[in-house]
Amino acid sequence: MLIGRQVLTPAREDLIRRTIDSVAGTKHAILHMYNATSPTFRSVVFRNTKEQTIELAVKHTKIVKQLTEECTAKYGTKFKYEYSPETFSQTEPEFAVEICEAVKAAWGKSGIGEDRIIFNLPTTVEISPPNHYADQVRNLILINRSDAFITPSPD
């Protein structure tokens, strides 16, 4: 992909629409969507179960896919999709893999090339030793070695 714009949006349909509108007509764009996945955010902030959290990510990934395809058809903008399980470093490793796999399936584009999904794995609050984060990243790399880009993001 050539140089383009990168935009960030939470998993909210109204904001996804506005975000895609903001890059319509550019040649290339990376749309980066996120939703919080850690137990505290799931139970206290959003009052969601694991299943509801996955449903939220999958639903909004499908919206991103539909809207970016429409934008490409209308304006020619080529999109890459980046997903972050926000609060990744506080998320149970097996759940992080599960939600990323569900998002990848909903995006429906994988394999070699520019269509591969990008997983951004943020560690924004250091609550564990660095090797714990490294193990979490490794778990996702082992699952997604050939059909996704993995981008550790220690902030």
Regions inferred by a protein language model and the residue ranges of each:
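Alpha/beta enzyme core
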Residues: 1, 13-151
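A glycine-rich helix N-cap at a beta->alpha junction
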Residues: 2-9
